Each structure stands twice: as C-alpha cells, then as structure tokens.
Curated annotation (Swiss-Prot):
One of its GO terms (molecular function) is structural constituent of ribosome. This protein binds specifically to 23S rRNA; its binding is stimulated by other ribosomal proteins, e.g. L4, L17, and L20. It is important during the early stages of 50S assembly. It makes multiple contacts with different domains of the 23S rRNA in the assembled 50S subunit and ribosome. The globular domain of the protein is located near the polypeptide exit tunnel on the outside of the subunit, while an extended beta-hairpin is found that lines the wall of the exit tunnel in the center of the 70S ribosome. GO terms for cellular component: cytosolic large ribosomal subunit. Disulfide bonds: none annotated. Belongs to the universal ribosomal protein uL22 family. SUPFAM superfamilies: Ribosomal protein L22. GO terms for biological process: translation. This is Large ribosomal subunit protein uL22. It comes from the Bacteria. Part of the 50S ribosomal subunit. Keywords: Ribonucleoprotein, Ribosomal protein, RNA-binding, rRNA-binding.
Length: 129
C-alpha cells in the first residue's frame, strides 16, 4: 500500500490536521469519525465533548488542531467551518504474547490507526425576498 502517488491537494478554503499512530483499532476510531463527518465544527466539538467513547478526546484534539490551522495558516472564518472529511487509516499492529496455562502462549495484537480531518469554510447563501 504505502503512500498515494498523487495525494489530495487542499483547496484554498480547506485546512487539514493529521493524528498518526493512535492506540486504537481503526474500526473503533471510525465510529467516532463518522459521528462528526459533515457537521459544523461547533456541533462536532460539542458531540465529542459529551461522547462516552475513550478515543473521543484524541479526535477532539485533532479537530481543534484543524480549526487552528484554518484560522492561523489559511485565514478562514472559524464560525463557518464544516468537517468536510474525517477518515481513518490503518497503522502498525503491535504483537504481544499472553501467557496461558500448561506452558502455552497466545498472541495478542494491538492495532494502531491514523486519523485525518479536513475542515472546509462554507459560505451560506442568503436569499433575498
């Protein structure tokens, strides 16, 4: 697999933050990422604050980093930001041994994940009556 030959280029109204090697399985992390996908940043932060999932704090920290990148690096208005993309990638799998009875051992796999969050500035159209 590895890196993509032509990674996706960010548009002028987008900002990105990446959290690498997070100690959680991609399946569990994707549940939280799907929860914020497509929402306004304020609503997504509120959802993550009150989520009972263990990994929600790390996702919130990454989202706050994306918002800070949008504000400081791209001069975007943070009140009109939307979570455009939130996707999860598979990272390494750490192998450990678990001692069992009768001199046996079994293998435990501890998966890691990558998280990428892209926020986009959306200008809402005002209808004139």
């Amino acid at each position: 697999m590895g890196k993509a030959k032509f990674p996706r280029q960010l548009k002028d109204n987008e900002a990105k933050a990446v959290a690498r090697t997070i100690r959680v399985s991609p399946q569990k992390l994707n549940l939280v990422a799907a929860m914020i996908r497509g929402k306004k940043v304020g609503a997504a932060l509120a959802d993550l604050t009150f989520s009972r999932k263990r990994i929600a704090g790390t996702v919130k920290k990454t989202l706050e980093s994306a918002v800070a990148n949008a504000e400081n690096n791209h001069d975007l208005d943070i009140d009109s930001l939307v979570v455009a993309e939130a996707y999860v990638g598979k990272s390494i799998v750490m192998k450990r041994f678990h001692v069992r009875g009768r001199g046996r051992a079994s293998r435990i796999e501890r998966p890691f994940s990558h998280l990428t969050i892209i926020v986009r500035e959306v200008i809402e159209k005002v209808e004139v009556a």
